[in-house]
């Protein structure tokens, strides 16, 4: 049996990555992950404790999710803690940040500029689209960005 802190950490990560429309689906996912003694009432308490809410997504489906406010950066947050994920395709790098941090991180990346392979950035609230100066060197540019936040 895995410990309750490990369960709660896994539970929150699961809610961030997966889409669940019912508590039964969450129970099934936790049991499949190796957690014992999981039932609907326990999941209900965990949802309440974590502050999770059931809300509609863009497809009008009701899903459980953690509120964005839980990730609001504070004045003492190191910049590297504000960057949650960095990924790319063949033409663009996408950087996911804590809510409210994207413009700060984008401004930092803009200051680095073309010398490090960054042509420009567009930032929303929690997502940055970064265009490299050379799409053939996009992996190299992504590595430079990752090294800034490790």
UniProtKB/Swiss-Prot annotation:
One Pfam family hit: Arg_repressor_C
Pathway annotation: Amino-acid biosynthesis; L-arginine biosynthesis [regulation]
Keyword list, A-Z: Amino-acid biosynthesis, Arginine biosynthesis, Cytoplasm, DNA-binding, Repressor, Transcription, Transcription regulation
Signal sequence segment: none
Subcellular localization: Cytoplasm
Cross-referenced InterPro entries: Arg_repress, Arg_repress_C, Arg_repress_C_sf, Arg_repress_DNA-bd, WH-like_DNA-bd_sf, WH_DNA-bd_sf
Single GO term (MF): arginine binding
An individual GO BP term: L-arginine biosynthetic process
Single GO cellular component term: cytoplasm
Main location: cytoplasm
Top-level taxon: Bacteria
Role, per record: Regulates arginine biosynthesis genes.
Classification via HAMAP family: Arg_repressor
NCBIfam families hit by this protein: argR_whole, PRK05066.1
Family membership noted in the UniProt record: Belongs to the ArgR family.
UniProt-recorded name of the protein: Arginine repressor
Name of the coding gene: argR
């Amino acid at each position: 049996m895995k410990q309750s802190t490990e369960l709660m950490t896994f539970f929150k990560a699961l809610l961030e990555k997966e889409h669940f429309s019912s508590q039964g689906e969450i129970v099934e996912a936790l049991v499949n992950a190796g957690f014992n003694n999981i039932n609907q009432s326990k999941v209900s308490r965990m949802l309440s404790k974590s502050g999770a809410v059931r809300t509609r997504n863009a497809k009008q489906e009701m899903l459980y999710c953690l509120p964005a406010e839980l990730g609001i950066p504070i004045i003492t947050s190191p910049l590297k803690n504000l960057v949650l994920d960095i990924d790319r395709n063949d033409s663009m790098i996408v950087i996911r940040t804590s809510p409210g941090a994207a413009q700060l991180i984008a401004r930092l990346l803009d200051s680095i500029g073309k010398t490090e392979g960054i042509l420009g950035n567009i930032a929303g609230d929690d997502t940055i689209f970064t265009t490299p100066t050379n799409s053939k060197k996009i992996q190299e540019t992504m590595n430079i960005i990752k090294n800034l936040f490790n």
